[in-house]
Amino acid sequence: MPCSQLLGDGNTEVLDPLAWIHAQQNRVGLMANENVYGWRYYGQERPPFALEPGQGQESVWDYPRPPRIERVSREVIVRVGEVVLAQTHQACRVLETASPPTFYIPRMHVKDEYLYRAGGSSRCEWKGTARYWTVSVPPVVLERVGWSYEDPHPEFESIRGWLSFYPARIECHVGGTRVMAQPGGFYGGWITPDVVGPFKGAPGSSGW
């Protein structure tokens, strides 16, 4: 997400993976103490409170800082009701310590007729200045629900003009699974069943 914006365990008995993820988030306040640990983890080691990833899962505490970009072959879909706003097998995800991945979609795979430039901007130390987008699919209008980097820093040139969206406010899917939003309301990470935390944005995580 725009970094400065203010706006499990593989158990096969778990039938609803997103419900299990929600339970992870609720546990964060019990597992982490920001005053003890602070922000000193950058992907080289996991903090004591990090959940152990199961088979086929990733820990967000193994992601680097500064973040890196990774290509995604799974289908990514963003929709408003019955209208598919974006659909692609060529997305990228940005991986940063403690946060679930943020997915960016090529502009050519987003329906421009529903996009309107919104006011304001924010700045990320890694990616540059984010511009915001409103989605209008009458009668639904979602203000500042997406963002893009139109002139990113050189390391993020590959996502120039690509769009990401807040899954807390618009329906997002990866590989056929509905995405869950990063906790806290400040961030735009996409939580899928193959990613474990705890995640930045939950209670007790402001020092991460």
Model-identified regions with their sequence ranges:
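Terminal leader/tail segments of proteins
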Residues: C3-W208
